[in-house]
């Protein structure tokens, strides 16, 4: 399975997801500014992976910090990383975790602080892999044997520290002996499904068929799809789900055709401070992602473009939310809160 991100003595090493599937290349970030750029430019993407990258960004930032006004330097590091992408709550969760640890060590020798932050960032990474495997185990039973699973965007090993959330459920179902295959939406405009999900599943020899986003309803109506499993970037207290743009359309089609629609995400993706998805900030990305594909224009020059990176799926379309602590069902205000407080 692909290694998405790793801490090394030379810096934070991550696979360059903008180059896949044609080129498997790795980028080494040697300071926190380079980590921030990698997150913003989607060299690394996926909510859990962004969280791990942010933790490592704080750690590497403090490695290069001087003795003077360390508090101010840590604040700047955290603020820079927090400004990279607004929707994925895991980013802020990881930054807050690292900042709290730093706060608990304020006044200790700088080398001790540096060492402890590195260790914590590595713990965040290892925890994420273990969490993803637990999500997979909890979701495997929900996947119907002998059917096709539809997924949107990429919520696999590439979107996490390893194994994946939505693709982790698929992997776990196959490991349990189920005979399933996958339909992957191409996921315009950044093509995460075509470029990343198909490539990743091919690495594991999982049977995968690529379809365009506007084909999903056709195959659901034809009875080909057993269930839909997607990831999430932020989940509100009422169960509304922010995920890659186009997810809402898939969920509506699934409801219309009686296809179960599952969301696989770690507890860290829950944002119970938000009562509904209407409060989730939606990132707007550049027009060039829509007007160009691999650097080639596909629209007339000067075309007006809107490019929201995410949409919000209302909870009424969600059959279940699969976490490492179990599966939540409606009413989500109660079930999600119960999962969060579960030891």
From Swiss-Prot:
GO aspect biological process, one term: L-methionine salvage from methylthioadenosine
Pfam family, any one: IF-2B
Coiled coil: none
An MF annotation (GO) of this entry: S-methyl-5-thioribose-1-phosphate isomerase activity
Known role: Catalyzes the interconversion of methylthioribose-1-phosphate (MTR-1-P) into methylthioribulose-1-phosphate (MTRu-1-P).
EC numbers: 5.3.1.23
Active site residues of this protein: 233
Name of the protein in its database record: Methylthioribose-1-phosphate isomerase
UniProt-annotated binding residues for substrate: 45-47, 85, 192, 243-244
Class in the EC hierarchy, top level: isomerase
The keyword Isomerase is annotated on this UniProt entry: yes
Keywords tagged on the record: Amino-acid biosynthesis, Isomerase, Methionine biosynthesis
InterPro entries linked: IF-2B-related (IPR000649), IF-M1Pi (IPR005251), IF_2B-like_C (IPR042529), Initiation_fac_2B_a/b/d (IPR011559), M1Pi_N (IPR027363), NagB/RpiA_transferase-like (IPR037171)
Involved pathway(s): Amino-acid biosynthesis; L-methionine biosynthesis via salvage pathway; L-methionine from S-methyl-5-thio-alpha-D-ribose 1-phosphate: step 1/6
Family to which the UniProt record says this protein belongs: Belongs to the eIF-2B alpha/beta/delta subunits family. MtnA subfamily.
Keyword Isomerase: yes
Source organism, top-level taxon: Bacteria
């Amino acid at each position: 399975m692909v290694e998405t991100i790793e801490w090394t003595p030379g810096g934070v090493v991550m696979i360059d997801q903008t180059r896949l599937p044609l080129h498997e290349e790795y980028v080494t970030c040697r300071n926190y500014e380079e980590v921030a750029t990698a997150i913003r430019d989607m060299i690394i993407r996926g909510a859990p992976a962004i969280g791990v990258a942010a933790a490592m960004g704080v750690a590497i930032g403090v490695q290069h910090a001087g003795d003077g006004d360390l508090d101010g330097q840590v604040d700047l590091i955290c603020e820079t990383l927090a400004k990279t992408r607004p929707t994925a709550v895991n980013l802020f969760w990881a930054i807050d975790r690292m900042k709290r640890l730093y706060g608990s060590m304020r006044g200790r020798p700088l080398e001790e602080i540096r060492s402890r932050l590195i260790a914590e960032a590595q713990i965040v990474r290892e925890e994420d892999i273990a969490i993803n495997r637990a999500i997979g185990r909890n979701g495997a039973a929900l996947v119907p044997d002998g059917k096709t699973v539809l997924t949107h965007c990429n919520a696999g090993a590439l979107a996490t520290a390893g194994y994946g959330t939505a693709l982790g459920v698929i992997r776990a179902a196959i490991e349990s002996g189920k005979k399933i295959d996958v339909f992957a939406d191409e996921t315009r405009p950044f093509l995460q499904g075509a470029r990343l999900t198909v490539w990743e599943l091919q690495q594991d020899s999982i049977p995968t068929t690529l379809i365009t986003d506007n084909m999903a309803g056709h195959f659901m109506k034809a009875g080909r799809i057993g269930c839909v499993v997607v990831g999430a970037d932020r989940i509100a207290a009422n169960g509304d789900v922010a995920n890659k743009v186009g997810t809402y359309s898939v969920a509506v089609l699934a409801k219309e055709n009686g296809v179960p629609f599952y969301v696989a995400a770690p507890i860290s993706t829950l944002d119970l401070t938000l009562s509904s998805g209407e409060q989730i900030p939606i990132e707007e990305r550049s027009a060039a992602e829509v007007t160009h594909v691999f650097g080639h224009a596909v629209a007339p020059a000067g075309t007006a473009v809107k490019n929201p990176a995410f949409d919000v799926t209302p909870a009424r379309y969600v059959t279940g939310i699969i976490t490492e602590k179990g599966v939540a069902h409606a009413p989500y205000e109660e079930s999600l809160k119960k999962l969060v407080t579960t030891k």
